[in-house]
């Protein structure tokens, strides 16, 4: 197979075992909708830029490429970057008003669009910023589920994911970690440099952000300094994974359970305690439940074309006992649709693993937890199984529709939910993994073909099929029906399918439903609305 070079997706989905997601990259981030990649991810890129330039910028220029240059308004991507630059967090309700906030502070924001560009990843945001007379150019990418990678700072390549502490700086010579540590009075684990035209650009990583004294000493050595501090309350402290595969997960779970292995995995990865992990998981669960309530409240005003009350309509039918799929699946689907409508209305949701699929896991687990009268600890265990499932997939394959099709979002969410349902029902570790495999392979090939731009058509209703598929897979696994293709090989198949999927079917508004007459008409309406929104 020839590998396309247009967006980097083939490289990103090639089984990158160097990348080690957290459990809370799978059930997280907790965020304001509508897109984990193009809203929450953009906030995080904005936060990184703010940190690197040392505070709020004086001017902001944003560059969007390819499909994102036409969908960014529906995803609130421009608002997201600006919100981050102003110091807001991913779950801030002020994201939707960030452009107005910048204007009120006298900060000009200019968006540059390049829809025909194929030289950049469609998940790229390129920023040009000024602060206190200094100019900066910083480039970042969203890589799925709210995760980010900063790729360039002032023309120099970098590889930063948002959890690092330390500093970037330019100097007239190269510094090794030991030399730099002695010079500034801080301890650096690593210091690597690249050179261009006699300028040495350094990435110096420490276990904590630099003190004011160390920063002052560094400024005497450097021509330009970019502060670096981790963005969230956990970080990668050990890149050696506890388990690499579902086979290894099962082998380790024989002596305990998948939830216990998940806790051990995160404790090793992030240097946190079991109590911290369970408390943070409970926080994700509370957000999920709140998003269900918000979604069925019939007060949602989605950004684009949907009415915002389809979940409530289905719930009404279920409550009357008139739906065909029964009370459990019907309720779970109604809740999933409602959560997605809340997401489209820029309410707070928990990406699981993405915002575009954030209805599947809460719809399934809340409904079955009520059915089974599950305790809080049992629900946390089920979420840990779902999260561990997501980690082992995301470790090797992108969880982004723009990078791998909707199979990467709804497919992975359905697999996570199926595994969590089996855990909730008292299933074995093997049954949990089989449920994952059965669910994921049923949705292989699902394309990403959004209509016009907002995270609505077909995203909202595709969460419904993710729910139905999760229940079917969970029931089969609980009956000891096995996937002939083993779980890890099903992930291999996902990667293969992602690589073969053409860019026209990966969120570019070209193929699938986006090619229909109605979709083209809605696209024209949306683009006109975009022009009016500036």
Which role does the model predict for each range below?
Residues 30-43, 341-366, 407-414:
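Glycine/serine-rich anion-binding loops at beta->alpha junctions
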Residues 50-61, 88-93, 368-383, 424-435:
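Phosphate-handling active-site elements
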Residues 33-37, 323, 352-355, 377, ...:
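Alpha-helix capping and helix-loop boundary segments enriched in small/acidic/polar residues
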Residues 61-111, 384-420, 430, 442-469, ...:
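A structural-propensity feature for long, helix-poor, extended segments
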Residues 2-149, 154-179, 183-346, 480, ...:
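Generic N-terminal targeting/processing segments that precede catalytic cores or assembly contacts
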């Amino acid at each position: 197979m020839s590998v396309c070079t247009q967006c980097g997706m083939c490289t990103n989905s090639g089984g990158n075992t160097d990348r080690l997601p957290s459990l809370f990259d799978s059930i997280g981030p907790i965020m304001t909708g509508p897109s984990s990649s193009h809203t929450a991810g953009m906030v995080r890129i904005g936060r990184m830029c703010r940190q690197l330039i040392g505070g709020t910028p004086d001017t902001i220029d944003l560059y969007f490429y390819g499909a994102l240059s036409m969908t960014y308004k529906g995803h609130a991507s421009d608002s997201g970057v600006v919100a981050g630059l102003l110091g807001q967090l991913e779950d801030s309700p002020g994201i939707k008003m960030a452009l107005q906030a910048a204007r009120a502070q006298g900060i000009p924001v200019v968006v540059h669009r390049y829809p025909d560009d194929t030289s950049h990843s469609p998940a790229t945001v390129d920023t040009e910023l000024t602060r206190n007379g200094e100019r900066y150019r910083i480039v970042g990418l969203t890589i799925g589920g709210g995760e980010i990678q900063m790729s360039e700072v002032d023309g120099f390549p970098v590889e930063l994911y948002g959890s690092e502490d330390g500093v970037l700086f330019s100097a007239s010579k190269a510094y090794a970690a030991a030399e730099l540590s002695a010079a500034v009075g801080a301890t650096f684990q690593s210091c690597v440099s690249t050179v261009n035209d006699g300028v040495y650009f350094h990435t110096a990583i420490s276990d904590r952000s630099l003190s004011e004294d160390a920063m002052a000493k560094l400024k005497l050595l450097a021509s330009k300094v970019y502060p670096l501090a981790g963005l969230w309350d956990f970080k990668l402290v050990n890149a050696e994974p506890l388990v690499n595969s579902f086979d290894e997960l099962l082998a380790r779970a024989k002596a305990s359970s998948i939830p216990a292995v998940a806790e051990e995995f995160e404790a090793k990865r992030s240097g946190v305690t079991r109590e911290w992990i369970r408390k943070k998981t409970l926080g994700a669960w509370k957000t999920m439940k709140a998003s269900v309530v918000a979604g069925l409240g019939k007060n949602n005003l989605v950004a684009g074309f949907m009415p915002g009350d389809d979940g409530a309509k289905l719930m009404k039918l279920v409550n009357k006992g008139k739906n065909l799929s029964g009370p459990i699946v019907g309720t779970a689907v109604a809740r999933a649709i409602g959560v997605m409508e809340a997401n489209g209305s820029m309410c707070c949701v928990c990406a699981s693993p993405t915002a575009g699929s954030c209805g599947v896991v809460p719809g399934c687990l809340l409904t079955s937890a009520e059915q089974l009268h599950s305790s809080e600890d049992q629900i946390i265990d089920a979420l840990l199984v779902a999260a561990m499932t997501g980690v082992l997939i995301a470790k090797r394959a992108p969880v982004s529709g723009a990078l791998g099709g909707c199979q990467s979002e709804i497919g992975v969410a359905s697999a996570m939910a199926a595994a969590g349902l089996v855990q909730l029902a008292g299933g074995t570790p093997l049954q949990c993994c089989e449920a994952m495999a059965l669910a994921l392979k049923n949705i292989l090939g699902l394309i990403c073909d959004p209509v016009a731009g907002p995270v609505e058509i077909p995203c909202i209703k595709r969460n419904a099929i993710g729910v139905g598929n999760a229940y079917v897979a969970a029931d089969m696994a609980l009956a000891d029906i096995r996937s002939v293709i083993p779980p890890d090989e099903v992930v291999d198949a996902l990667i293969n399918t992602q690589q073969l999927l053409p860019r026209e079917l990966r969120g570019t508004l070209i193929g699938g439903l986006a090619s229909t007459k109605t979709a083209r008409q809605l696209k024209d309406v949306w683009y006109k609305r975009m022009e009016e929104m500036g």
